[in-house]
Amino acid sequence: MLIHVRDVLSAAELQQTRELLSDAPWADGGVTAGVQSAQVKNNQQLPQAHPVTQALQQLVMAGLNRHPTFFSAALPKKVFPPLFNRYGGTANAFGNHVDNAVRFITSGPHTGQRVRTDVSCTLFLAEPETYDGGELVIEDTYGSQRVKLAAGDLVLYPGTSVHRVEPVTRGARVGCFFWIESMVRSDEQRRLLHEMDQHLMHLRRTVGETDAGVIGLTGTYHNLLRLWADT
């Protein structure tokens, strides 16, 4: 399931993000790669414990916490602290790879916790017209999905996916990436719950909150979530 979540960050928050990134201490992105993915990773990344990273993390988490589509699609149990990367110049691509199944938090208030990477997420921080290339390419059973979104939008996709970032040939692609351990481990079950939730939201707007069918379907949604969720 690939989900486009719009307007996670407001225009004011994006401006604040750009101001913070203007003096960012970019470093070699290979430091967070596994042995295999390090062979194809060629980008830059902000150090996890740097104050700029921590300020950006607060902005991103605030955007996620208020966004109903993000919650509906991801059903987050744990969110790995957001990381920030840059593709451009000679450090401009990341070849095909699969994310590690479990990530270990090494800084911040949740240091020492492990996060199972059920859902991968990329939040775009640069407008698409400011750089060439840089598409996130996600391989799934329907073929290759190419993603290049407006600044402030994000994409959610299964952590099991083979994916890559195409070479950036002009400008710089700046983004945020992180992983989610979901209350519902199965991608198929999350997809069904998200689709049901979106249809319910439509029915609630068009039929009303007190319609018997709407109340019954709401109960079915929550009973399925109760059956499948692990909190």
Curated annotation (Swiss-Prot):
It comes from the Bacteria. SMART domains: P4Hc. Keywords: Dioxygenase, Iron, Metal-binding, Oxidoreductase, Vitamin C. Residues 78-182 form the Fe2OG dioxygenase domain. InterPro entries: Oxoglu/Fe-dep_dioxygenase_dom (IPR005123), PKHD_C (IPR041097), PKHD_hydroxylase (IPR023550), Pro_4_hyd_alph (IPR006620), Pro_4_hyd_alph_FE2OG_OXY (IPR044862). Fe cation binds at H97, D99, H163. The keyword Iron applies. One of its GO terms (molecular function) is L-ascorbic acid binding. Pfam families: 2OG-FeII_Oxy_3, PKHD_C. Its cofactor is Fe(2+); L-ascorbate. The keyword Phosphoprotein does not apply. 2-oxoglutarate binds at R173. Transmembrane segments: none annotated. Its EC number is 1.14.11.-. PANTHER family: PKHD-TYPE HYDROXYLASE YBIX. NCBIfam families: PRK05467.1-3, PRK05467.1-4. This is PKHD-type hydroxylase Lcho_1570. It comes from Leptothrix cholodnii (strain ATCC 51168 / LMG 8142 / SP-6).
